[in-house]
Design a protein with these regions (language model features):
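Extended, hydrophobic alpha-helical segments
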Residues: 1-41, 45
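Charged interaction segments
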Residues: 21-28, 42-95
Length: 95
């Protein structure tokens, strides 16, 4: 089993992906590295670059990532369908 890199945001603990992540952390404690951090995104181009990098990680390395954004305005998380895309990926691969 690959190593899962889990980064979760704390703005709304009722989101579906948070429940999934918690379940995975409980089920596979030896395979998961848990990090918390804050990102400050200053431009759309930076945001897109980071999203593209995340997609490459998910596709090429078997890593899933949920981003902690509690230092940013919460609207950023919903922008461009990022939360939906990550949540859908988690459900597809891990449910």
């Amino acid at each position: 089993m690959g190593c899962f890199l889990v980064m979760f945001e704390l703005y709304n603990p009722e989101k579906n992906y948070t429940k999934i992540v918690n379940k995975i952390v409980d089920s596979y404690p030896d395979h998961i590295k848990l990090f918390k951090f804050n990102w400050i995104l200053k431009s759309d181009s930076t945001r897109y670059d980071i999203i593209n990098d995340l997609a490459k990680l998910i596709d090429n390395e078997g890593v899933f990532i949920v981003i902690e954004l509690d230092s940013l305005h919460p609207s950023l998380w919903a922008t461009r369908g990022v939360s939906t895309a990550i949540n859908n990926w988690l459900i597809k691969h891990l449910s």
